[in-house]
Amino acid sequence: MPKQFLALMGKPILHYTLKTFQESGLIDSLVLVVPEKELEHARADWLEHPTIVKQVITGGKQRQDSVFNGYQALPADTDIILVHDGVRPFLSKDMIQETINIAAEFGAAITAIPVNDTIKQVDSFGKVERTLDREGLWRVQTPQAFRYDLLGEAFRKAQKHSFYGTDEGALIENLGQEVRVVDGSEWNLKITRPEDLVLGESILAKLFPEA
């Protein structure tokens, strides 16, 4: 089962993610991108009730392909597009607002937090090659926001040169364009491991006490 459909305090992780977007009042419409085998299940869950989810579509082989599918599903008169990992349910309204504001001004904005751990470069045999200077290093999160036309240009260039980035910010960098950073949060957890669910329940109790 995809991680975003795993239960957190009895509800899918995605429930809390969408709840924050819905209640923020900042999003006009949302395109949900899911694995093909989860398409009908997701449509039944999220399109039967009035929400900002307007379409549920299938993803691609890689993250970049999935985001591109979502991009194509949006109307051409879209101003700002926001990309978010469904398994980050603890984003805040302030993060959404700030990424939108910065993207509107500069074209591209990503949420991130400074690296505070020691970072080692390690070879394929597990041998440490060197210790990296963490000054100026940030751990990137989502949401990430972009002007619609700029992200489209970035996708076209990436496809032309078979470039794959690990996030959409990398596609903008590949254009030679500026990407601005918005403060993220340690609470903006990406739930990918069983132990993340335990931590997520603790965060959930603080952010969604009614859950």
Question: Regions from the language model: what does each represent?
Answer:
Residues 40-45:
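Acidic helix N-cap motif at the loop->helix transition within catalytic regions
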Residues 138-211:
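Conserved alpha/beta core of the MobA/IspD/sugar-nucleotide pyrophosphorylase nucleotidyltransferase superfamily
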